[in-house]
Amino acid sequence: MHQPYSTVTPYITKDGSEIRELMHPSLHENRNQSLAEATIPVGTKTLLHKHMETEELYHVTRGVGRMTLGGNILEIVAGDTICIKPETPHCLENTGSEPLVILCCCSPAYSHEDTLLAR
């Protein structure tokens, strides 16, 4: 399978970030995971949320920010990788001067139905 980046249309997901689904079972022939690029604009943050089934791996490819991960606050920079276990509340804040860009690998694949916003 091959997915040219130029053909991926971004959308806004439930947490407020701009997402490009680079590989997802609903669009491609892969089965058990998804890979997306998330962009958080300067001065913004995503909504606190959790996934009941999905484990996520985030890899920061550009920018700097702050991540809430359960009860921890992490300062993140390009090159950092974070594991988010199921049922762990999390959100991202862009604290830098350029977009915060993250590769997100989800297993099982991301679904809106598995995303619960914090109250």
Question: What kind of region is each of these model predictions?
Answer:
Residues 1-33, 47, 114-119:
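A short, N-terminal "cap"/entry segment at the start of jelly-roll beta-barrel domains
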